[in-house]
C-alpha cells in the first residue's frame, strides 16, 4: 500500500467536488449544503489554504487534507477507503511535511468518528464554538 500526498491543482477540481457530494448529509463542519460547482471551482482556484493535498493510494485519488493559515486541519477520505488506517498514515505524513508545532481540528460535536480519530492522535477537546448568521 503506497500512500502519497500531492498538492492540489486545477485537474483535481472535479474530484474535490465529488468528495463534497459524498460528504453531503454527513455530519461535517464546513458545509451545510453543497455549493454550486462554479462556486466550488472558484474557491479551489483561489488557493485558500497554505497546504492542501490530494491523498493518493497506489496513484488513485482517495481524499484530501488541508491546513488553513490559522492552523486548522481538515481531512476527508472517500468512504470506500475509511477505517483501514489510511487516515492515521496520512495525518502523520502531512504533519511531518508541514512541520508546525500546533494543529487545530474543528469537528462537529456529533461526528463521533472524527472525534475518536483526532483523540487517538493526541488532539484534546478545548472548546465548543457557536455560530450565528445574520441576513
Question: Where do the protein language model's features map onto the residues?
Answer:
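Conserved N-terminal entry element of GNAT/NAT acetyltransferase domains
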Residues: 1-11, 135
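Short aromatic/hydrophobic contact patches that present stacked aromatics
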Residues: 4, 72-74, 104-106, 131
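Helix-loop element at the rim of GNAT/NAT acetyltransferase active sites that forms part
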Residues: 8, 18-33
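Hydrophobic alpha-helical core bundles mediating ligand binding, dimerization, or RNAP-core interactions
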Residues: 16-21, 40, 44
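Acetyl-CoA-dependent GNAT
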Residues: 33-80
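Conserved acetyl-CoA-binding loop-helix of GNAT-fold acetyltransferases
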Residues: 83-97, 112-120
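Conserved GNAT acetyl-CoA-binding A-motif
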Residues: 98-110
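Conserved catalytic-core motifs of GNAT/GCN5-like acyltransferases
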Residues: 106-107, 124-135
Amino acid at each position: 500500500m503506497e500512500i502519497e500526498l500531492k498538492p492540489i491543482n486545477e485537474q483535481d477540481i472535479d474530484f474535490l467536488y465529488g468528495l463534497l457530494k459524498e460528504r453531503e448529509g454527513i455530519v461535517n463542519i464546513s458545509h451545510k449544503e453543497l455549493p454550486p460547482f462554479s462556486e466550488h471551482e472558484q474557491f479551489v482556484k483561489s488557493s485558500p489554504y497554505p497546504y492542501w493535498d490530494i491523498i493518493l493510494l497506489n496513484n488513485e485519488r482517495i481524499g484530501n487534507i488541508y491546513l488553513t493559515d490559522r492552523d486548522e486541519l481538515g481531512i476527508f477520505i472517500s468512504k470506500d477507503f475509511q477505517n483501514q488506517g489510511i487516515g492515521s498514515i496520512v495525518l502523520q505524513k502531512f504533519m511531518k511535511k508541514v512541520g508546525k508545532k500546533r494543529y487545530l481540528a474543528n469537528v462537529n460535536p456529533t461526528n463521533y468518528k472524527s472525534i475518536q480519530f483526532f483523540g487517538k492522535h493526541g488532539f484534546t477537546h478545548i472548546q465548543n464554538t457557536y455560530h450565528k448568521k445574520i441576513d
